[in-house]
Swiss-Prot record:
One of its GO terms (biological process) is protoporphyrinogen IX biosynthetic process. Its cofactor is pyridoxal 5'-phosphate. This is Glutamate-1-semialdehyde 2,1-aminomutase 2. PANTHER family: GLUTAMATE-1-SEMIALDEHYDE 2,1-AMINOMUTASE (PTHR43713), GLUTAMATE-1-SEMIALDEHYDE 2,1-AMINOMUTASE 2 (PTHR43713:SF1).
Length: 429
C-alpha cells in the first residue's frame, strides 16, 4: 500500500502537535516506529485513509465504535440534536431518558452521574469511595489501565505489602504511597494486601473482565472472593467497566458474571462515539456526591445533550434482537481461523477471545495475568501488525490491545482478514 500522504501529514503534524499524536497509543512506537496512518473517514466496519486505502477496522477507536463507523441511526440522532443545540448548562430531559436506559440495563446503578471520559469516571469513583469509607488507600491490579489520573498511574511494588511507585513522570511519590498493586487473578496476593493494610483500604479497583492487557477472564471464584474479602474489611469494590459495559451483552460484565460491585465506572461504548464517561452505584454511597454530600464533582460538559442523544441512539441499536449473537459468531469464526493458521505456520501464539473481542498474543502459554503479556514477543507482534496493515487490516499498534468486532463486520470481512493473516504468518518464519 502507498502511505505517502500519511507520511507527509505526520511530518506536518509533528510541527504542531506534541509527538504528532493526541494520545500516545496512536503512535507506532510500540510496533517498530513509522508514521501512523492518517484516516479520513469511516463507514461501517471500514476506515479510509488520506491515500485512498481501505481497511477492515478492528481497532474501532479502542472500543467505542461497537455499531460501526457513521451508523445511520446514531448519525441522524447527533445531527438532529446538533440542530437544536449542543450545550445548555442546565438539566435536560435527555439526561433522564439515558439514565433510565442505563439503570434498566445495569441494575446496580441505583444512582448515576455523567462525566466526560473514563478517566474522570474512575477518578471520581475513587474520591466517592474515600469519602464514604473515610479511608485513603486503594488496591488496583497490575496491568489494568484506569485512565491517566495520578492515582492510577502507579506501578506495582515488590509484593502485596509494598506500596507502589509512580508509573509516569509528574506523579508524586506521595500519591503512589496511597496505592497497592497486586497481580490479577491472584487471590492470595489480594488477601495478603488486605490483611497487611486492613482498615486503611478504601476501595479495590477491578476490571471484571480485563481489557487492557488484552482480553482476560477472571479465574473461577476470583471476583466472588474479592467481593467477600473486601466487604469483610469494610472496603468498597469499584468495577471499571469503561471497556466492558455493553461489550459482551446488553448490560455490564458484572451482570454476565453474576458478581455485583458497590460502584461502577463506564464510558467508551455508551457514548455512541462521542466523549462520555459516567459512574454510579449504591444510593447510600452515591449520596456522598455534591449537592447531596461532601464529595465534589462537576463538569461543564457533563451530561451534554449531544452525548446523551448519541448514547440513547446507540443503546437502541444494541437492544435489537441478535446483535450480540452475531458478534459472538463472528468472533468464533475469527478465532478458529487464526488458530488453524497458527498451527499451519507453526507460529508461537495463543488467543484469548470473549464473545466479539479477542487478543492474539505471541507467547506459548494461555494468558491469565499481566506478566505473561509483558514478556510476550513484541517484535513478532510488530511484524504481524505491519504485514496486516499493508493488506488493509487495521489493528491496534500494541501487543497489549484487543481486536474489536462490530455489528457491521461480515463473514466476508473475516475471510479476508484470515487470508491476510495467512500471508502475514507465512512471512514471519
Amino acid at each position: 500500500m502507498n502511505f505517502s500522504e500519511s507520511e507527509r501529514l505526520q511530518q506536518l503534524s509533528n510541527e504542531y502537535i506534541l509527538g504528532g499524536v493526541n494520545s500516545p497509543s496512536r503512535s507506532y512506537k510500540a510496533v517498530g516506529g513509522g508514521a501512523p496512518v492518517v484516516m479520513k473517514e469511516g463507514h461501517g466496519a471500514y476506515l479510509y485513509d488520506v491515500d485512498g486505502n481501505k481497511f477492515i477496522d478492528y481497532l474501532q477507536a479502542y472500543g467505542p465504535i461497537i455499531a460501526g463507523h457513521a451508523h445511520p441511526h446514531i448519525t441522524k440522532a447527533i445531527q438532529e440534536q446538533a440542530a437544536k443545540g449542543v450545550l445548555f448548562g442546565t438539566p435536560t430531559e435527555l439526561e433522564i431518558e439515558f439514565s433510565k436506559k442505563l439503570r434498566d440495563a445495569i441494575p446496580s446503578l441505583e444512582k448515576i452521574r455523567f462525566v466526560n471520559s473514563g478517566t474522570e469516571a474512575v477518578m471520581t469513583t475513587i474520591r466517592v469511595a474515600r469519602a464514604y469509607t473515610k479511608r485513603n488507600k486503594i488496591i488496583k491490579f497490575a496491568g489494568s489501565y484506569h485512565g491517566h489520573s495520578d492515582l492510577v498511574l502507579v506501578a506495582a511494588g515488590s509484593g502485596p505489602s509494598q506500596l507502589g511507585s509512580p508509573d509516569s513522570a509528574g506523579v508524586p511519590e506521595s500519591v503512589a504511597r496511597e496505592v497497592i498493586t497486586v497481580p490479577f487473578n491472584d487471590i492470595n496476593a489480594y488477601k495478603e494486601a488486605i490483611e497487611f493494610w486492613g482498615d486503611e483500604i478504601a476501595a479495590v479497583l477491578v476490571e471484571p473482565i480485563v481489557g487492557n492487557f488484552g482480553m482476560v477472564m477472571p479465574q473461577p471464584g476470583f471476583l466472588e472472593e474479592v467481593n467477600e474479602i473486601s466487604h469483610n474489611n469494610g472496603t468498597l469494590v469499584i468495577y471499571d467497566e469503561v471497556i466492558t459495559a455493553f461489550r459482551f451483552h446488553y448490560g455490564a460484565a458484572q451482570d454476565l458474571l453474576g458478581v455485583i460491585p458497590d460502584l461502577t465506572a463506564f464510558g467508551k461504548i455508551v457514548g455512541g462515539g462521542l466523549p462520555i464517561g459516567g459512574y454510579g452505584g449504591r444510593q447510600d454511597i452515591m449520596e456522598q456526591v455534591a449537592p447531596l454530600g461532601p464529595a465534589y464533582q462537576a463538569g461543564t460538559m457533563a451530561g451534554n445533550p449531544l452525548s446523551m442523544k448519541a448514547g440513547i441512539a446507540l443503546l437502541e441499536v444494541l437492544e435489537q434482537d441478535g446483535v450480540y449473537e452475531k458478534l459472538d459468531s463472528l468472533g468464533q469464526q475469527l478465532e478458529e481461523g487464526l488458530l488453524k493458521l497458527i498451527e499451519k505456520h507453526n507460529i508461537t501464539a495463543t488467543i484469548n477471545r470473549i464473545y466479539g473481542s479477542l487478543t492474539l498474543y505471541f507467547t506459548d502459554e494461555k494468558v491469565t495475568h499481566y506478566d505473561q503479556v509483558e514478556h510476550s514477543d513484541g517484535e513478532a507482534f510488530g511484524k504481524f501488525f505491519k504485514l496486516m496493515l499493508n493488506q488493509g487490516i487495521n489493528l491496534a499498534p500494541s501487543k497489549f490491545e484487543a481486536w474489536f468486532l462490530t455489528t457491521e463486520h461480515t463473514e466476508e470481512d473475516i475471510q479476508q482478514t484470515l487470508k491476510a493473516a495467512d500471508y502475514a504468518f507465512s512471512q514471519m518464519k
